[in-house]
């Protein structure tokens, strides 16, 4: 049995799960299949391209007639060969169980595969939360258009409600759509007449401000800044010099404390899986495709942001050692609230993230579920999984729930402060 698949959830929960690792919520995921069988422990078979050569978007394993045990990927015509070419390696690693075998795969990539290991023992205290994200609450403030709820007045009201219930997040996340245009990545002046004033007010309360960032979207971008499919703009192109200059200047505007800038503190990067994929794509730098193109985008965001504010937080859902150097924190990502296995699925994802990035902090994300009991169970247990994250302050969250969550957060923060003091971590 291989633990993997396109949606990165346990194989046993999906009877028709394809044996393919693709770019889903975890983008990219670990490109390895750990097998268990009659033998002891687990053996993983993984793809290991060299740095700069991740021009792929999937890794498949086929167990059909005449193709049993076939591992494959596809370069889709984006790899040009003049002379000799070395295919990405297939490596085999072993462990006591599936996760142990995946850990060995990750370790090989750090040790032999050119991936950069990041020391994560001392990070800024505020990176570890708790967090409040306004996405769920935007729908309360604007029931007919959740995006309209991403405005300064609504977020100021959210901040006041946090205060009223003694909820003390280390950061507040301004979610989709604070931007006027997704690709431009600048505040909508109608929704946010003075974002700097909001940020400074949150700073005065001891909170940082993170901005939700939609990757790839070309809204507001020129054709020159885009990946094209048969001459049609298809998404932001991180190899375009014009787009690169835009992002570098935009990061300065969003993060700098200089006059005329917004002094925000980092980004929650979403929609990485909605990247341009398939044949006939054209980038400014020829033949950069798939995971390699995503690495270029994440590197552009990360390096441009850190050049302005070194302690800013970059939160994303990458889950592969090749992305360790552009990832400060992992987010467990969306869950189908119509299902009833929230903890099981999120715990599984957290183990995968920590397998790819040893020591990383994990944003436990939205506790969305159709069941109030399951939602509260998740919020109570979230500190055992990672950084607690709250998305709602009304509707299914009751006043007594908020008071309970305030107590959970207080206990979590006290444990964290004690740990930081004993380890000498950053504040």
Regions found by a protein language model. Name each.
Residues 1-170, 208, 266:
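Carbohydrate-recognition beta-sandwich/jelly-roll modules
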Residues 108-133, 165, 173, 194-232, ...:
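Glycine-rich, aromatic-flanked loop segments that form ligand/cofactor-binding clefts
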Residues 129, 139, 143, 147-152, ...:
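Active-site-adjacent "subsite" loops/lids of carbohydrate-active enzymes
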Residues 131-153, 178-193, 229-248, 279-294, ...:
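The substrate-binding groove and active-site-proximal loops of carbohydrate-active enzymes
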Residues 157-160, 193-204, 249, 253, ...:
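Alpha-helical scaffolding segments of alpha/beta enzyme cores, especially the outer helices
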Residues 166-178, 247-284:
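Active-site groove signature of glycoside hydrolases
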Residues 181-184, 219-222, 275-279, 323-325:
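Extracytoplasmic/secreted cell-surface and envelope-processing proteins
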Residues 219-245, 249, 295-424:
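Glycan-recognition surfaces
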